[in-house]
Structure formats: structure tokens, C-alpha cells
Amino acid sequence: MSSLRPEEARKLATAASVSPLSNCQFSGVVISSIADEQKLEFTNKYKGSCTLLCSYDSQGVVLRVVSDDDRSHVLKEYMIAADTDAAQMGRRSYAVSLDADNLVLRFASDQDQQLFRKVVENVKHLRPKSVFSQRTEESSASQYFQFYGYLSQQQNMMQDYVRTSTYQRAILGNAVDFQDKIVLDVGAGSGILSFFAVQAGAAKVYAIEASNMAQYAQQLVESNNVQHKISVIPGKIEEIELPEKVDVIISEPMGYMLYNERMLETYLHARKWLKPQGKMYPTHGDLHIAPFSDESLYSEQYNKANFWYQSAFHGVDLTTLHKEGMKEYFRQPIVDTFDIRICMAKSVRHVCDFLNDKEDDLHLISIPLEFHILQTGICHGLAFWFDVEFSGSSQNVWLSTSPTAPLTHWYQVRCLLPMPIFIKQGQTLTGRVLLEANRRQSYDVTIDLHIEGTLISSSNTLDLKNPYFRYTGAPVQAPPGTSTQSPSEQYWTQVDTQGSRNSSSMLNGGLSVNGIGDGMDITHGLMHPH
């Protein structure tokens, strides 16, 4: 048996007022087991009456049983899922198969039985699937919410100083948009954005979170004494109900290449709760696309695939899989960062308007491309990054993942061409990027490029769900061939300049070697290595 803290019960009661079909409780329930199905004989499962506590879960509804006489312990916990067998028995009873138990629940009133029946129907096929469920595979959703249910993953995002500080600055810098307003936080996670909204003077914040992180957000709300301001609601925005419309929607819905994870569709769906002339933070997103040249990256992926070109690997011929291996490696988008000087043309910008675009607009995104090439070289593929703007009443604030901006946990993304193309300065590179949404909460990315006025073209289709995380933390190197002066002479000139600054130390017995050091004793390190 596990303990049920009083605050958990209060949370369930609070959530019930907002989403009654997935968060509610029933007292005075007599629970019986079916001892003999043919004779319909029943035995009491628990001594005395019980209370059923229903709470939302990404897979359905969790049903916890506690005694009416002692609510401090959970007697049993069940999961009501889409395949749960259940049937009404008379006006106050309900038969349900949970795990290995065939139970009959006798409720204290007709109304309680009817509401419980709706709870069950809410997660069964009797009820139409939500927009989220229709577009998402169950296995993908389960993995997704499990991932974001870990504190370590929330910490990874919260410790992105650029991300977190930009959101706080955008919200606090536009306090007039939040003062005494009703705010909706979509995909709240730890609730950090909800806290920022309260700092800006929000009257009420509804923090919606579908993963198990909701329980931790609730703990933070209570420990910071803002439960009168922030209401944490476990559930998906596509499925929960709010008691009122909101003035502002805040969220951090961006994924790699802006669109990955398809959280933007959830963000747009939340507009059904937004008052006319309401605000969205962020307001719009710009996806930037540019052709790039990087022989090192291309060779790295190509050589990985050549593993499968071995004809005698421990006596086994692998070459039959070389073609498939090559295809798999080049289907992987590369997540890392780079020097923007590898880009061969000015980026093309594709705008997503969070205030006006529709969810359906993000199911198939077609982006026409036209690049005027600025430098001759080999185009190995396309680079992607995004910026989002917070358009506030007082000021506009930008969050950028550009290679010229401070690095964020989104990095940048590059998509390689299996067959690179040589292109000259002054030529025009045209084509299209097609982002086709899939039920794995991601996109299939198809690239088609063509050098205008020629027969030269190249294409590739990549799986954004399966990226290669290449970033190592090492400093970004300048592209080869970008030095216009001798790097060696530049370095020694810098050293000599530093040495002249320290020359005065030599007059006081200091030691200087090649201009390095200020009274540094190098013999200690040579004779006594650590």
C-alpha cells in the first residue's frame, strides 16, 4: 500500500472542477468481487465503503481506491484504459474488469454512477479520439510523455540560459500584457513559465501538463505559496476543459527545425481558449534555410556507411547491406552547430504565424527555395535554424537559434544530400523543402534542389524523428580557407604584444619566455610533473 498525501487529494478535487470527466472522486462506494459468474454471487472486496479517486494519465485514467474510514493509504490502484471492459448494472452499479479483478461498484447515488460511466467512456472508443490522439501513435505519445516526465529533462531545458532568460525577459518586459490577466501555459512542464507570468502580475494561470511532471509542478506551486495563482491541470490541451477564456497563452512549443515533435499544433489548438485580441507568447516563428558546404561532415557520414562495404568482416561479407546503410545515414538530420561562413547564400525565411495559422497548415509544409550563390563550392545540403518573436505591448523580444547567436539546446540542424552538387558564385539554386507530418510526432523532410539553367539537381528525404546528435562541446572551427593572413604570424604578434606589456616584470627579476608569462617559473613544471 502507498500513502496518499492530503495535498494530492486536494489537487484531485481542484482538478475535478476544471476537467470533471478525468479528475474526480466518488465517496461511499461499495466494491464487490464477482465470486461466481454463473450464479452472480458477490463478495465484498474491502471492508466498509470506499472512495474512488480518478486522475488523468496519458494512457487513460488512474483509479485509486482508499477507505472512507482511513484515506491516508491507497488500498489499490487500477488503470482504466481504452480496452477496459465495463458495463452498467442497474441505476447505481457498474461492472468493470480491472487487471485480474472482476468488480462491481455500487455508488452512493445515481448521479455518481452516471459520472463514473462517463469517466470510463471518456477513455474508451465510445468517445471520439481527441485531435492529439488522431494524429499520434500511442507508442510515440507514451515515449514522449515519459521523456518529459523526468526532472533531468526539465533541468536540461531550464538550464538553457538563453531560452529561460529570454522568456522571462519577454514576459516581465511586457508586464502590461499580464497584469491582472488570465494566462494559459500550454505544456507547462515544471511550470517555470507560469511562475514568470505570476511575477508579471497575472491574476490566474492555468498550467496544463500531460506528463507526470504535473505532480512536480504542483509541488513547486505549493512550496512557493502560489496555489491561489497557479492551477496545475494534468492533461492534454486537446482534451481538458477550462472554466473560462484566457487573455494570454504562453508556451515553449519549438522543437528541432522549429516543427519537430509537432507541439506547435498543440499550441495553435490552444487558441480555442483565447479571448479576441488575446496575446500569444511567442507570437510567430521564422524557419531559416541556407545551402552549406562542409566536406568534413559529408565525409564523416559517408565513411560511416562504408562500414557496410567490407567483404571480410570477421569472415562475413557485409556488402549486400552497403546501399541500405548509406541510405540510413543520409536520412539522419545532423544536430550540431557551425560557423555561418559555411553557408553559400543568404537564408530563405519561412514564417509560421501563431496567431493566425491553422493546425492543418502544419500537416504539409511546402517551402519554395531560391538562393543566389555568394561563393563557389560544393553544396552538401541545407542548414536550418529558427527565430521566434514575442510581440508585446511594451517591447518585442527575439529568441534566436542562429549560428551567429549564443548556443541553445536546439543547436542547428543540417540535412545532407547523398549526391552533393558543385555550384558557382552568381548562379541561382532553386527548389523546395517539403515537411510532411507523420504520426510519430515528427516530419519526413524532402529536399529537392536544382541549379537554374542546367540539368544538375539533387534530392533527399530525411527522417526528422531520428537525428544524429553530433555536437561535442568543442569550439566551432572556422571553415577551411577563410584565413586571409598568416595565422602563425597573427598568433606570435599577439604573444609579442602581450610580452611587451609584461616587460616591466623582467626589471624586477621576472622571467619571460617568448613573451609568455609574468614571473612564471617553468622549471617546476618540468622537474616535478603532476
Swiss-Prot record:
Key words, A-Z: Chromatin regulator, Cytoplasm, Methylation, Methyltransferase, Nucleus, S-adenosyl-L-methionine, Transcription, Transcription regulation, Transferase
Residues the entry annotates as binding S-adenosyl-L-methionine: Q154, R163, G187, E209, E238, T266
Domain SAM-dependent MTase PRMT-type span(s) in chain numbering: 141-450
Catalytic reactions of this protein: L-arginyl-[protein] + 2 S-adenosyl-L-methionine = N(omega),N(omega)-dimethyl-L-arginyl-[protein] + 2 S-adenosyl-L-homocysteine + 2 H(+)
Cysteines paired by S-S bonds: none
Record's subcellular location: Cytoplasm; Nucleus
EC number, UniProt record: 2.1.1.319
Keyword Transcription part of the UniProt annotation: yes
Transmembrane segments: none
A Pfam family that the UniProt record links to this protein: PRMT_C
GO CC terms, sorted: cytoplasm; cytosol; histone methyltransferase complex; nucleus
GO molecular-function term, one example from the UniProt record: histone H3R17 methyltransferase activity
Alphabetical list of PANTHER family matching this protein: HISTONE-ARGININE METHYLTRANSFERASE CARMER-RELATED (PTHR11006:SF10), PROTEIN ARGININE N-METHYLTRANSFERASE (PTHR11006)
Subunit structure as annotated in this protein's UniProt entry: Homodimer.
Family (UniProt): Belongs to the class I-like SAM-binding methyltransferase superfamily. Protein arginine N-methyltransferase family.
Protein name: Histone-arginine methyltransferase CARMER
Organism ancestry: Eukaryota, Metazoa, Ecdysozoa, Arthropoda, Hexapoda
